[in-house]
Amino acid sequence: MKAYALLYSVLASLTVLELAGATGVTSRDSDYGGFGTSDDTAHKARGTSSQCTPFSIALSSSDTAAFDTSFVAISPSGSYGLVQDGLELFLDRPPGQITTKGNVNNKVAEGATINSTFTLLHGRVTFTFSGPSVAGVVAAAILIADQHDEIDVELVGGDPQHWQTNVFAPAPHDDQPLYGVFGEIEDYPRGPKSVDETHSYTIDWNTERVQWSVDNATVRTLRRDDTKKNGALHYPTHPARLQLGIWDASSPAGTSEWARGPVDWNTAPRRMSAKFEHVEIECPY
């Protein structure tokens, strides 16, 4: 994600502090912004014990109490809804006339964002969900810390036969943000698949590496020592919450290019959605 997501991250952090009070739930899906770690700091963090509680929820309108206890919405109430077989996060067409210049729209839709009311430090998190296969639209399931460390799964609608993984934990002395340096485009290993089909995406995170899987097939391992850039490690070391979201990547230009955007609202549905069916946390560390 690019600068648009960073701005939204800052604004959403303020909003959710007002909503959640002492729950400690903050921030928005952003690959960028926050603090990295020096070698010394990261070395100390390697000895940090896991803070993880097993958790499992089948998202459904038949059990709203479990959802209300475990998650808090950043976006307005009308931007999401529980149905019998999942949680739908909506992205609605912006009001008024939308014009496109180059690969940027003059208006960007506000999508739904849901945060967990709890954090974890290390563990295995599986998100079962799908997103729209519409260019310029991104559905995301991420781990995000108050310090803005991130571990991401992203479904880019403009590239529906692949999905993306990323880690972002910038160091304060970087000359410039390392946008996309640790991002990677992944295949679906068991034949042609699409982001608009339901799949189970897993982030397995410990002190030494992050591993991503889809439908129980491991596709990527990023080791802590491989995140060293500019003399500093860029590895997530802080407790993080779960974040579920859908967003419009039609601006700025760099974001839109990454997301194969902008959204063509002449052909795209007026309302699109990502559907999350199940979330599970395992604590093997």
Give the location of each predicted region.
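Classical eukaryotic N-terminal signal peptides for Sec-dependent ER targeting/secretion
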Residues: 1-11
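GH16 jelly-roll
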Residues: 3, 19-213, 217-285
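Hydrophobic h-region of N-terminal signal peptides that target proteins for export
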Residues: 12-19
